[in-house]
């Protein structure tokens, strides 16, 4: 985490500071060892990863879906956005000589709560919505506001507020998000074609047709870039190629828009590195 202190006092009753952090999402299976995707291995589920969330994590997840999937066209220039957690995170703040100190069990727990919520939301989003192909984590920032509080053992109560989600530096390639319009045009055209081809088919037949559609158009090729770990190539490249992760995410995208319940999972096979 990086910190930038900025003291703003009014008769020493309020002290404010700025803080920041970074998370790697489970969007790329190879990254999942460093992410919180294991949060979703704790129980059985019958719905999306996002359906397992609640509180602050669910609120941020819903924003990610709204901003990067539903309203993606509004985020082609910048993918940064401000947000607030509905469940306010507070802690017993340590203030010495008019300056907020980043220490104490209460503060450490509060910052962990922030990161856990952002991590869980990002992981669930990246697995549920691979159509946001460019996304693989984010920087985030927020302000800490400390006020005098007689009920706090330290004499001050700290609150986290004014959050900013800033994923640009974690994209699979520079400014990849700017290609979301072309990507989604490709998705919708392919879905329309598949819907026409699968009229009258049962679900099993539709799934087989989606599988064949992808395999007939894509070459398995690993060029050691993050691009081939996404579905981007199928919808953006003249000569589509990716690794198994790209195949899985393409299947997930088609199933989503064709009304077929589907989930991406990651793991290892015969001692290989993580994959989807």
Show the residue positions of the predicted features.
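Generic hydrophobic secondary-structure packing signal
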Residues: 117, 206, 240, 274-275
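Conserved hydrophobic/aromatic pocket- or pore-lining residues that grip, position, or stack substrates
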Residues: 210, 214, 244, 255
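Alpha-helix capping and helix-loop boundary segments enriched in small/acidic/polar residues
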Residues: 178, 238-242, 266, 271
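Secondary-structure boundary elements
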Residues: 175-237
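Hydrophobic (often cysteine-bearing) scaffold residues that line and stabilize catalytic clefts
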Residues: 203-206, 243, 247, 251
């Amino acid at each position: 985490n990086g910190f930038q202190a900025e003291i703003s006092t009014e008769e020493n009753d309020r002290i404010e500071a700025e803080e920041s952090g970074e998370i790697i999402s489970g969007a790329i299976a190879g990254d999942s060892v460093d992410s919180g995707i294991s949060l979703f291995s704790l129980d059985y589920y019958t719905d999306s990863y996002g359906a397992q969330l609640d509180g602050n994590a669910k609120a941020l997840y819903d924003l990610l879906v709204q901003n990067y999937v539903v309203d993606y066209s509004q985020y082609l220039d910048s993918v940064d956005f401000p947000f607030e957690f509905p469940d306010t995170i507070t802690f017993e703040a340590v203030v010495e000589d008019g300056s907020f100190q980043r220490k104490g069990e209460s503060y450490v727990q509060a910052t962990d709560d922030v990161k856990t919520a952002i991590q869980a939301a990002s992981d669930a989003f990246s697995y549920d919505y691979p159509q946001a192909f460019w996304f693989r984590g984010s920087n985030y920032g927020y302000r800490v506001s400390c006020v005098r509080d007689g009920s706090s053992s330290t004499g001050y109560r700290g609150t986290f507020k004014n959050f900013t989600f800033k994923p640009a530096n974690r994209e699979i390639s520079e400014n990849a998000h700017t290609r979301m319009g072309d990507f989604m045009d490709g998705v919708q055209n392919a879905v329309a074609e598949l819907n026409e081809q699968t009229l009258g088919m049962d679900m099993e037949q539709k799934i087989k047709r989606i599988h064949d559609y992808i395999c007939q158009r894509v070459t398995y090729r690993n060029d050691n870039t993050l691009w081939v770990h996404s579905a981007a190539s199928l919808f953006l490249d003249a000569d589509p190629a990716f690794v198994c992760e790209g195949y899985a995410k393409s299947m997930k995208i088609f199933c989503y828009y064709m009304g077929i319940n589907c989930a991406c999972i990651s793991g290892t096979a015969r001692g290989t590195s993580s994959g989807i």
